Each structure stands twice: as C-alpha cells, then as structure tokens.
Amino acid sequence: MKKTVVCMLIAAMTMGSMVTPVFADGDGDATHIYVLTAPEDHGWTGSVATFAKEKIEEVNGDGTYSAELITSANAAEQIVNIEDIIAAGEDNIAVVIQPIDDTVQSAIQQLVDAEIPYVAFDRIIDGVADSAVSNVKGDNEGIGAACAAYYTEQGMKPGDAVYVYEGDTSSVTTLRDEGFTKYLTGELEYDGKTIADDAKWSEDDLKSITYSGAMNWSRSDTKTAYESLLGDASNADIKWFYAEDDELAMGILEALQGGGIDDATKEKFLGNAPYLTGCGGLDEIGRASCRE
C-alpha cells in the first residue's frame, strides 16, 4: 500500500511538471497538488491517507511542489471538496483523487472541463478513466486469481460452496470478483500458471459462489453480516471464504471470537477446517488462512 501511494504522488509530481507551462503564473509559483482520499479511520482505505500524509510532508519539504491532503467521509463530501477546488479558480494546480465511489464521476468530469489535470488512484471510474493523466491501481484481478489458485491448491473442487465478501460496488470489487472466477475457468493465470484442466470450473459450477454485496470495506458491517449468515446453522458447512480485504476478514474473525454465533454452530463450522483469505497486509491478520 505504501509503495502504491508513493507511486501515486510521483505520478502527480510528474503531472505537475507537465502542466506548469500552461498553468504557472507570472511569479513562477510551484504546482500545488490536492490529494483527495478517505479519512484515516475509514477501514483499509484509511491507510492511504496515512501514507499520503507522510509523502506530502516530503514533497513540501523538498520545495519543488506543494501539496495538501483533503479527506472525505463519503462521496457527497468528496464531490463538494472537488467543486470547492474548482470554484477557487487557482492557477497551476493538479489533483490526485481516490474516488469514494462511482458517483464522483460527475465531479471528476468538472475537473476535466476546468482543464485541471488529475491522477486517479485505486478506484478507477471507467467513464472518465481516459481523461486522467494516469490511473494508478493495484493488481485487483491478480488478488482474486491468487485466492482461487490458493484454494484450488488446498483442495477446493469445482462446484464447492464459496462465499465472497465484497468491498463495495466499484471497479476494485468487480476486478477482484472477476480475477477469482476467471482463474477457476482457466481464462486467467496466476504466477505464470493456469488451473489444471481437470480442476476447471464450468459456468454451472460458478453458480455455487455466493456474493455478500457491498460491505463498504467495513469490519463491523462484515462482522454483523457473518453473524447473520451463521444464524442459519446449515451455512456452517461452507468451507471456502474469500474476503476481498483484510478489514473484511477481520470482521469474520471477530465474529468467530465473539458471542454473536451459537456455540454449536461455531463448533461445527470450525470442525470443517474452513479457509479464509484477505489482502492488504494488515498486521492483525498474521496469515491468510483461518483454520483450527
């Protein structure tokens, strides 16, 4: 995550050097970079703001460019923040944005119309992606493929029940979903290899995968949803859980450690030697599988 945030700001600084001749005023002021992210207490996405603050301090200390962080708790607030930047009418500015969700597209289009260059980070909105100076994101399909490859290696068979805890409705979740299923059907490789022919899943097999819907990258939302899932004891038979982020995985682990699940159901579930994966490098996770 930290490496990706650094790359994001490097892209923004490169962008600043590209646009300075267009937007610089007579005094030759340095390009000012606005960095828009979720707040630091906003699940895994909060780490983006934390690392961005560190890099912004370095940028400001160097003196070639200036930068500031603006956090937004939700999409509506982020849209207002973008509109405020545009309304200020400043010269020689650039924007780095981690869109809260796809509804921010209209505000990003306003940046384009105002000829303010921007870098999109992490959540790429297809409708405006071509207008960005750069789209910086992780290998989200690769994350899904990695989980599918690991589970296949651990014995998951075509048609086994799988439960996927999704982050939100953005391109990040779509790609992590697709990476998982495309590996299973043989359309996508992982680590230079494709799934063995005798282990491939058919379209009918994929129907055994259940999707949670948007958990908003929230540990508490996932904990509540998981307790509800295991409120039906028959779901204790599900062995394979793909959480699309470590915060979601932690919600499941906290549910298993808490008192919201019937003890008999919990014992049945853990007796199945279930698997759980996440991603993001959260220190609390320790390892990708959940087995007892």
Task: Give the residues covered by each predicted segment.
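Gram-positive cell-envelope targeting signals
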Residues: M1-G26, A52
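A residue-level marker of the well-folded mature domains of exported/periplasmic proteins
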Residues: F23-E292
